[in-house]
Amino acid sequence: MKKLTIVCLDADTLGDINLSVFNKFGEFKSYATTKPDERMERLMGADVVITNKVIIDKDVMDRCELKLICISATGMNNVDLEYAKLKNIAVKNVAGYSTNSVVQQTFASLLALLNQIKFYDNYVQSGEWVKSDIFTNLDAPISELAGKKFGIIGLGEIGQKVASVASAFGAKVCYFSTSGANNNAFYERLELDELLKQCDIVSIHAPLNEKTKNLIGERELNLMKNGAILMNFGRGGIVDEGALAKAVDERGLRACLDVLEAEPMLAGHPLLSVKNKNSLIITPHIAWASSEARATLIAKIVQNIENFIKENDGN
């Protein structure tokens, strides 16, 4: 196969990872970000596009001559897959590269909440501990993960590893299968309403699809125990964020979120105005992005391109 022209449309979403490895395939161009009206010009003459969030739709595929679409993520909702198949354009995503990173961030956020890390760090950094008459401070109660009922929504690869870690902490793990097809012998399977009613902690690790969109709304949040913790490390759009903000302030619900329906977060978002700020941890979609995970991601994109070349050798 001839040398390829490869274009990366949103390199900023990959951070400080070195992309020079793609030069070995031919000509490589990289753009920090790409607006919708810049896609056509930048992809003219390109054989391969690397995209994380930039949409590759029918219009792009009709006006450009792409042979391969490399998605620098697991989710594929930014590409019109049916039309790509019709146009005989190969589409490759990357799965499994960020499992350890997401699991680690899940528990980093959860433990920060359970152990009131924000409160106690602020207490010390503000100089209040210096003024104390005793060696400790118990103003914000902390609690253990051991013995808690830990519900997982979406028991895929990440969900299973979260279950394993939660079990190691001594939590009692159960799960709800969003597809309805998962029957795991190691953990108790519950229907969604029962899981929400019973669990002290509920952790979402599901994709966004027709079965999970708006899965957790006001009704579902009201089923949860007062003071329970809801975590979303799956996709925005699964949880009604306005209803969650209300539940945090009115029912003492606590939450750890790494994904929102609109990203970046919108100005005036109800979660920015909650009164119980120590009950809420929000990170900007970083769970996937350890340095190790991003290095693995690039290596797997390279492998996808190499496999494509082998499959089309002689064409």
Residue ranges and their predicted role:
Residues A32, S72-A73, I89-N100, S177:
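Short beta->alpha connector loops at strand-helix junctions that form conserved
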Residues V54, T74, D200, A206-L208, ...:
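Short glycine-/small-residue-rich Rossmann-like dinucleotide-binding loops
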Residues I89, A95-K149:
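Phosphate-binding beta-alpha-beta segment of Rossmann-like dinucleotide-binding domains, i.e.
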Residues I55-L66, Y83, K211-L230:
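Rossmann-fold NAD(P) dinucleotide-binding segment
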Residues M1-V48:
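N-terminal glycine-/charge-rich "phosphate-binding" loop or analogous flexible N-terminal tail
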Residues T136-N226:
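Rossmann-like dinucleotide/phosphate-binding beta-alpha-beta segment
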Residues G227-I229, F233-N315:
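Rossmann-like dinucleotide-binding domain for NAD(H)/NADP(H)
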